[in-house]
Structure formats: structure tokens, C-alpha cells
């Protein structure tokens, strides 16, 4: 269930992007080609991801110009200046990142040190893209519980140091595609938000921006690792299992990778989780005025849009906002950088809602948050938590004659409501299946021939029995639904074969 908030407001947002923007031609000065395949992969990836400019915290010689902690500190300073708040007024700092400049201590403590900030509560959220939302939730909970009046959430990423050509020398400048292509996907940057217990939105002209809820859900028990740093390509050994860092580097255990073959599952679970939020009344697509969606490539826009449309829960494209093309993909920082630029460039009105969605490929996670604009002159609204399902439409099944067999994509409103509920049921069922001993054996490559024969001995009779049940059920159909019998018979035949 999402975590609801009654007294948390976004007061200001800031960002820090190092140096000058780097276009697609200039990239080679920072992320030099590794081998003869590099230029071909680069052209393909850039054509798909739609990124025209990005930022790097290293120079053309590969030297670090800004540390990750300095990036985060820069975003915090920008955020505080925009909010007109002194650092001494903040009593909590939560950070989100895939990794700071040190393995220890925590990233939030390194940022606090970089800022020379006074004593305060700190929390370091370690993850990938959703870590920024995790930092926001932690800061918001501190305010909601009354422990803090002002709290900062910051997310910062600096993957460029992993992409320098020199990093691949130990492997003879050769690497697998899962590691190679990310060099043209990710870049550096930081974003920060200042949360408070009631202050007006900075520059909002008499508006407040209320954080309604945050929802995070991980499916790491269902799926294998998709994006990782620290394991070999086959995921059999970790970097600490080698005799030295040099051995780990030569084995590719220090290369950042993403298994793109698993990505379709990420969008599938993300949309199903969104459908559940709609079904339970946490968000109404018709009420969403601005949709801030984090995606790593513009190639995925039609994928997300198509899945939302099929679920009957689409948000019109004109309401979408992204700055991927000119800010780049900055991982955990992306959604905070996006919020900062959105608030600086858009005019908001009371009653508008801002819905944010962040999928994380690391080991599959989906994060969402909902903001609502209020007039600063009005008393704070205490919204009741959703109860049961959201009412998406007033139409009932009796209002429409459904000509079987029907097309779910063109289903009437009453049926769309049912399909939304069924999507949630399928979502839970699939998760349970993925965690069964049988599927775990397959995932972990422990599924041997005897296991397969045993499975088939149990499964084939069940399928045959199921086909008989389908045909018996089809034989009992009458009236308007009798036309479905032929379709069921075809499906039963396919199952049996």
C-alpha cells in the first residue's frame, strides 16, 4: 500500500549539472570508443534513446572535475537558494544513489561533510533509479511523524568514471554488449527537493505543492538481476571473491551491465502496479494533469503508452513531461532533476495533480508519487485514504451489448473496470509463480533432465484435463455468449496440443 501524507509539502527543488552540455559528437572526447564495434553500437543506441545532450563531471582527459558528493552539494545549494532557506534550518538529509565516491561511509554523510552542514539526521538510500524516490519518502516520513519541520532529499549519480576507456584496459578494450551500450546511455547530474510541513512553493505565486503519497514496490524475489555492478557477466562471482581488485577488473566484475533481454518484464510489472493503484483509488488517470515518467530511452515511450492504453488507463501524451533529450539519463537523480526543471518552466494551478513514475531495472522495482497543487491561502486539506476501488466510469455491463467474441482494446467502460481488476489478479499470480521452487530452479540454471521429465509427467495430464473442462464449459454457453464456444474450443485445442 502507498504511504500517505497529510502534512508534507514540496517547498523548492534544485539541480546541478556539471560543466557544459556535451552533444553526441563531443561524447567521444569523454567516452572514447573501445574497439571497432563501438561506433556502430553508439549510432544504434543514440538513435533509439533520443538523447542529444548530457553532462559529465570528468574532463576530456578523464580527470574528475566534480566528485559525486560535490554534485549533490551543488543541487542542494540550488534548491535552498530557490527556497530562500538556510541550511541551518534543515534537520534531515536523505540521499539516493547507486554509489557515492566511497564504499564507506554512507553517501549522505559524505554530502553533509561536503556542505560542512551542522549536525542533523542522515540516511543513505542505496539503489539505482528508484533510490531518489526512496530518499524523498524517507524525508517525507520524518516530517509526517513530526520529527522534522524541514528535510532535504537529494539524488546524485556519476557513472562517467566507470565509462572511461582506461577502465577497460584490463580486458584488452573488449567487453560484452550489456556493458558496452551503457556508455552511451548514462551521464552525470544531481537533483534535490526541500520538503516542509506547510511552506508555500517557492516562486509558486501563492501556491502549495502537497505530497499526497509515495509508493515503492520491489519484485526482486521474482526476477534475476538485470542491472548490476560488482558481478561477473555470468553473475557467478562477486568482485570481493577475487584475490585482488586487478583480478576482479580483468574478469569484468567491475563493469556496469544491464541485461536488456529482461527489460520487457520491468515495464509489464510497472504498468500492472499502476493499474492496481488506479483500482484501489490512489490515482485517477483522468485527474492527472502532468505525468513525469522516468525512462532511459525514448524507444520505451510507445511501449509504456501502449501498455497503459491496453489497460484502459492511458494518460494523454500532451500531459507527459521529460527532459531526457537535453539532460540525459542520470539514474536516481533523473526524477528530481525533472521535477526541478518542470517547476521552473511550468505554471501550475490549484487542483492540478503531478504523477511521477520511476521504474528501476536493477532487480525490478517500481516507484510512484503523487503531488497536488493547493492554494496557499486555503487551510490544509486532510484527504481520506482511498477505500476499495476507484470508480472509473458510471457505465455498467447492462448499459452495453457486448458482441462476443469481443476485443478487450475496444471494451466498454464497465468491462474495462473488470479488466483492471483482472490485471491486478494476474499481477499477484505471476509473482507467486516466479517464486515457486520449479521456476527458481530454471532461473538459477539448476533444472536438469530428470526435473524436466518429472514436470512433464505432472503437467501434461493437467493440461489435457483442463482442455476437457474448457470444452464442457463451452457446451453450456447459451444466448449471447454462445458465439464464444468456438473461440474456447480453439483455445482448448491449442492447450491440448
Language-model features: locations:
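Flexible, glycine-rich active-site loops centered on histidine and acidic residues
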Residues: 144-186
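Non-heme di-metal
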Residues: 398-497
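Claisen-condensing/thiolase-fold acyl-transfer catalytic domains that form or cleave C-C bonds
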Residues: 69-73, 99-100, 113, 118, ...
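Short glycine-rich phosphate-binding loop at a beta-alpha junction
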Residues: 88-96, 285-294
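Short beta-strand segments
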Residues: 11-14, 96, 126, 151-157, ...
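Short acidic, glycine/serine/threonine-rich loops at helix termini
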Residues: 22-24, 104-106, 137, 162-167, ...
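Long, hydrophobic, well-ordered secondary-structure blocks that form the structural core
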Residues: 97-99, 113-114, 126-142, 153, ...
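Condensing-enzyme catalytic core mediating Claisen C-C bond formation in acyl metabolism
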Residues: 1-66, 175-265, 359, 370-396
Amino acid at each position: 500500500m502507498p504511504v500517505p501524507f497529510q502534512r508534507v509539502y514540496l517547498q523548492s527543488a534544485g539541480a546541478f549539472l556539471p560543466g557544459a552540455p556535451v552533444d553526441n559528437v563531443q561524447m567521444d572526447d569523454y567516452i572514447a570508443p573501445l574497439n571497432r564495434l563501438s561506433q556502430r553500437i553508439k549510432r544504434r543506441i543514440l538513435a533509439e534513446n533520443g538523447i542529444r545532450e548530457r553532462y559529465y563531471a570528468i574532463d576530456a582527459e578523464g580527470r574528475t572535475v566534480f566528485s559525486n558528493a560535490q554534485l549533490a552539494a551543488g543541487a542542494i545549494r540550488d534548491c535552498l537558494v530557490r527556497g530562500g532557506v538556510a541550511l541551518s534550518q534543515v534537520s534531515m538529509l536523505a540521499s539516493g544513489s547507486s554509489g557515492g565516491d566511497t564504499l564507506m561511509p554512507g553517501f549522505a554523510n559524505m554530502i553533509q561533510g561536503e556542505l560542512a552542514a551542522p549536525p542533523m539526521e542522515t540516511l543513505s538510500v542505496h539503489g539505482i533509479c528508484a533510490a531518489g524516490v526512496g530518499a524523498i519518502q524517507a524525508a517525507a516520513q520524518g516530517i509526517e511523524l513530526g520529527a522534522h519541520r524541514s528535510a532535504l532529499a537529494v539524488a546524485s549519480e556519476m557513472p562517467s568514471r566507470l565509462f572511461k576507456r582506461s577502465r577497460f584496459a584490463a580486458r584488452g578494450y573488449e567487453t560484452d554488449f550489456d556493458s558496452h551500450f551503457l556508455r552511451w546511455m548514462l551521464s552525470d547530474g544531481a537533483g534535490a527537493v526541500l520538503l516542509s510541513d506547510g511552506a508555500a512553493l517557492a516562486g509558486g505565486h501563492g501556491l502549495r505543492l502537497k505530497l499526497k503519497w509515495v509508493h515503492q514496490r520491489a519484485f526482486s524475489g521474482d526476477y534475476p538481476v538485470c542491472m548490476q555492478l560488482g558481478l561477473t557477466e555470468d553473475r557467478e562471482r562477486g568482485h570481493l571473491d577475487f584475490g585482488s581488485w586487478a583480478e576482479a577488473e580483468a574478469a569484468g566484475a567491475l563493469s556496469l551491465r544491464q541485461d536488456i533481454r529482461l527489460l520487457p518484464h520491468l515495464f509489464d510489472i510497472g504498468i500492472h502496479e499502476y493499474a492496481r493503484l488506479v483500482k484501489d483509488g490512489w490515482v485517477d488517470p483522468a485527474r492527472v494533469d502532468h505525468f513525469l515518467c522516468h525512462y532511459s530511452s525514448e524507444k520505451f515511450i510507445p511501449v509504456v503508452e501502449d501498455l497503459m492504453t491496453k489497460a484502459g488507463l492511458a494518460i494523454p501524451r500532451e500531459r507527459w513531461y521529460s527532459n531526457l533529450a537535453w539532460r540525459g539519463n542520470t539514474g536516481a537523480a533523473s526524477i528530481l532533476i525533472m521535477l526541478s526543471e518542470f517547476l521552473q518552466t511550468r505554471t501550475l494551478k490549484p487542483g492540478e495533480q503531478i504523477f511521477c513514475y520511476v521504474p528501476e531495472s536493477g532487480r525490478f522495482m517500481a516507484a510512484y508519487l503523487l503531488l497536488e497543487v493547493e492554494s496557499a491561502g486555503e487551510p490544509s486539506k486532510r484527504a481520506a485514504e482511498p477505500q476499495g476501488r476507484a470508480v472509473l466510469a458510471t457505465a455498467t455491463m447492462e448499459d452495453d451489448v457486448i458482441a462476443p467474441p469481443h476485443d478487450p482494446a475496444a471494451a466498454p467502460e464497465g468491462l474495462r473496470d473488470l479488466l483492471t481488476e483482472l490485471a491486478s489478479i494476474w499481477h499477484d499470480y505471476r509473482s507467486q509463480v516466479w517464486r515457486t521452487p520449479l521456476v527458481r530452479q530454471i532461473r538459477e540454471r539448476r533444472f536438469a533432465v530428470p526435473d524436466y521429465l518429472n514436470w512433464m509427467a505432472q503437467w501434461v495430464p493437467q493440461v489435457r484435463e483442463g482442455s476437457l473442462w474448457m470444452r464442457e464449459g463451452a457446451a453450456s454457453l447459451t444466448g449471447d455468449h454462445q458465439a464464444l464456444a468456438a473461440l474456447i474450443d480453439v483455445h482448448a485445442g491449442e492447450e491440448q496440443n
